[in-house]
Amino acid sequence: MKRILSIQSHVVFGCAGNSAAVFPMRRMGMEVWPINTVQFSNHTQYQQGWKGIAMPAGHISELVDGLSAIEATQVCDAVLSGYLGSAAQGQEIVTAVNKIKQDNPNAIYFCDPVMGHPEKGCIVAPEVETFFKESALSSADIIAPNLLELESLTGMTINTLDQVIEANNQLLEKGVKMVVVKHLSRAGIQKDRFEMLLTTEDGSYHVSRPLYDFDAKRQPVGAGDLISGVMLANLMAGYSPIDAFERTNAAVDSVMQETFNRGAYELQLIASQERFNAPEIIVKAEKVA
């Protein structure tokens, strides 16, 4: 059994951050240790607003110190990070990653650099964006940006698939071993599909799934967090990057289809749980570079 430390946001109601990623990873056989960067009543796209707080400075470090004291850091196989409440939390995560890799040299760091949405813009403070560009990249083994986040990480303006591939290769040159672009958006080649791109030293692979016609004001939140969690769990289960990519695409499609069919605003993880371990792979990844 693989052990994953998951450091990201938490919502009491609904599915975002750890609330979107922890259950699927556990359902896939992972032992998951969640640490919350913020704790909100619900995700922030509700028109009625939300309540909650960012965890205080030192919170992450204190908990990781506790894990170290009981020697849990020695058996941690991966760290997954997502939404940050502050840049200081990011530095605490990097410190935690370094400690875990020191205790277990085989551990990996999967960074989901949550900054915003290609159609909605950046939602984090400038110092958080700077942290991802200047600190997270040097520590991450795997990074999973959307198009907006990829532009931020590379400083490129990206409008085509070739430019996405160029940007991904730029990240590989900085030491990242795998890039998973969770949403190609306008840079995609199939405007009626939801497209993703995987890049490793072996090349770049494109995959897509149906783009469901959710109401613009009722677009489910948390799909990116779900993608990162399921992708990491598949990799930890021993699947190759390409197989993990295909399985993740299929599993997430099942969740989105179930959510759409039920007319729900929150991801229907419970109703879709059988597909996390047994995804119906209809679309195979295609090598594009």
From Swiss-Prot:
Binding of ATP, residues: D112, A144, E149, K182
Cofactor(s) needed by this chain: Mg(2+)
Pathway: Cofactor metabolism; pyridoxal 5'-phosphate salvage; pyridoxal 5'-phosphate from pyridoxal: step 1/1
Residues bound to substrate: S9, T44, Q45, D225
Enzyme class name: transferase
EC number(s) recorded for this UniProt protein: 2.7.1.35
Role summary: Pyridoxal kinase involved in the salvage pathway of pyridoxal 5'-phosphate (PLP). Catalyzes the phosphorylation of pyridoxal to PLP.
Recorded catalytic activity of this chain's protein: pyridoxal + ATP = pyridoxal 5'-phosphate + ADP + H(+)
Similarity field: Belongs to the pyridoxine kinase family. PdxY subfamily.
Top-level taxonomic group: Bacteria
Name the record gives this protein: Pyridoxal kinase PdxY
Phylogenetic classification of the source organism: Bacteria, Pseudomonadati, Pseudomonadota, Gammaproteobacteria, Vibrionales
Keywords from the named record: ATP-binding, Kinase, Magnesium, Nucleotide-binding, Transferase
InterPro entries documented for this protein: PM/HMP-P_kinase-1 (IPR013749), PyrdxlKinase (IPR004625), Pyridoxal_kinase_PdxY (IPR023685), Ribokinase-like (IPR029056)
Subunit description: Homodimer.
